[in-house]
Amino acid sequence: MAARLLSLYGRCLSAAGAMRGLPAARVRWESSRAVIAPSGVEKKRQREPTMQWQEDPEPEDENVYAKNPDFHGYDSDPVVDVWNMRAVFFFGFSIVLVFGTTFVAYVPDYRMQEWARREAERLVKYREVNGLPIMESNYFDPSKIQLPEDD
């Protein structure tokens, strides 16, 4: 088990060294002794790059902060940038926050919780007035339920 792990780690280290161009000797573990074999990486010759490095023909991006120190990131034109920023903040804060919170505040009875409470109070009053028990074990009247016949 240990020999396998050492062999695996040795291969990983030699591969990492080969990627960096470092000379490495291959180490192979057999039973309790190490055998050093010549590296296969040393025999391989480095390939010359086929394409020469060229500068990017596109000019560098212009610095928009030099042209507009109050750049907000919406447009390179300063006037359009300011108008877009104002529109985003108007709709983001005025419309969404103000009208959104107003809508949430006036949303009718979420999940009908208030209605359920009022309905329960109404049923309790009805049962007390008519002398019925407040709660019954059967939701439906068992005499009205028709069950299928046993075969």
Swiss-Prot record:
Keywords: Electron transport, Membrane, Mitochondrion, Mitochondrion inner membrane, Respiratory chain, Transit peptide, Transmembrane, Transmembrane helix, Transport. It is a single-pass membrane protein. Residues 40-62 are annotated as: Disordered. GO terms for biological process: aerobic respiration; proton motive force-driven mitochondrial ATP synthesis. Pfam families: ESSS. Residues 1-29 form a transit peptide. It comes from the Eukaryota. One of its GO terms (cellular component) is mitochondrial inner membrane. The chain crosses the membrane at residues 87-107. InterPro entries: NADH_UbQ_OxRdtase_ESSS_su. It is found in: Mitochondrion inner membrane. Complex I is composed of 45 different subunits. Interacts with BCAP31. Accessory subunit of the mitochondrial membrane respiratory chain NADH dehydrogenase (Complex I), that is believed not to be involved in catalysis. Complex I functions in the transfer of electrons from NADH to the respiratory chain. The immediate electron acceptor for the enzyme is believed to be ubiquinone. Belongs to the complex I NDUFB11 subunit family. This is NADH dehydrogenase [ubiquinone] 1 beta subcomplex subunit 11, mitochondrial. The lineage of its organism: Eukaryota, Metazoa, Chordata, Craniata, Vertebrata.
